[in-house]
Amino acid sequence: MSRTSLTRFLIQEQHAGRINADLRQLIAVVARACTSISIAVSKGALGGVLGDAGTGNVQGEAQKKLDVISNEILLEANAWGGHLAACASEEMDHSQPVPDIYPRGDFLLLFDPLDGSSNIDVNVSVGTIFSVLRCPTNVELPGDDAFLQPGSKQIAAGYCIYGPSTQLVLTVGHGTHAFTLDREKGEFVLTTENMQIPAATQEFAINMSNQRHWEAPMQAYVGDLLAGKEGTRGKNFNMRWIASMVADVHRILTRGGIFIYPWDKKDPSKAGKLRLMYEANPMGLLVEQAGGAAWTGRERILDIQPDQLHQRVPVFLGSREEVAEAVRYHHAHDNAQG
């Protein structure tokens, strides 16, 4: 029996009235760009792409060579197709409208070109995360303000993970689906339809080295996880941590769990570590479409009205019952504080 290619899947979604032709073509372009990034990543040291680029991004983080390469691949692939009005990237200070020499479309594309790139030199899975919004009407030349929409306004989101196989995980608002790159044919093929995250879990993913910086409800919540069967939770938990959001979330979409990157006092000026627009929103939509939940610990991520392009937030996402439990600890603490 023949498998369904990404192209066929998108055409079927268009015929069902769930996406239009422009969105179909935009997603196809992003997928092709991810294929190019996958090739660059897989060459590793042979391609001379490892190591630092000697530059920094708007967040003050050192850029890897592959950060810069991946960003350029996505920008160049999407500039001329006529589907986009503007792009925004974690690696750029401001959004970038489509050049005047090309036609402008109705969509805005946001992306983290290479999430987890600090792991690339040690051959750990990394990935590309992307989100699609509609450009506000009557905006001729969209700037940063055009992107400041809550995650609930996303019309598509996805990520591509570059691991033992390259997989594209995608939602257009009707379930979350996984496609695997067939390298011989050069196309993505549907391998898991309607991914579902188990409601309950006994796995959590968190960087425990930051424990001393956490606020009280986080200390209590994780303390009860570690207490296991002898504690108030009455069951044992396993901890997993890859330090690559794409890899950690992919595991959760595949077999369940909760991914946590809370606010901490290590840098109290920042509201969290992860970026709302490039990481939390697209991953939140993918997880919710797979039956999971995505919160900051106190509010649903997709409800947040952003006030800046590179805004950061705490993130709790994955199995919905466990996310609800973590939220309960935070609300109980806040209520006790009055």
Swiss-Prot record:
Binds 2 magnesium ions per subunit. Substrate binds at residues 115-118, 207, 273. Its EC number is 3.1.3.11. Mg(2+) 1 binds at residues 90, 112, 114. It comes from the Bacteria. It is an enzyme of class 3 (hydrolase). One of its GO terms (molecular function) is fructose 1,6-bisphosphate 1-phosphatase activity. One of its GO terms (cellular component) is cytosol. One of its GO terms (biological process) is gluconeogenesis. Keywords: Carbohydrate metabolism, Cytoplasm, Hydrolase, Magnesium, Metal-binding. Pathway: Carbohydrate biosynthesis; gluconeogenesis. It catalyses: beta-D-fructose 1,6-bisphosphate + H2O = beta-D-fructose 6-phosphate + phosphate. Its cofactor is Mg(2+). It is found in: Cytoplasm. InterPro entries: FBPase_C_dom, FBPase_class-1, FBPase_N, FBPtase. PANTHER family: FRUCTOSE-1,6-BISPHOSPHATASE-RELATED, SEDOHEPTULOSE-1,7-BISPHOSPHATASE, CHLOROPLASTIC. Belongs to the FBPase class 1 family. Homotetramer. This is Fructose-1,6-bisphosphatase class 1. It comes from Stenotrophomonas maltophilia (strain K279a). The gene is fbp.
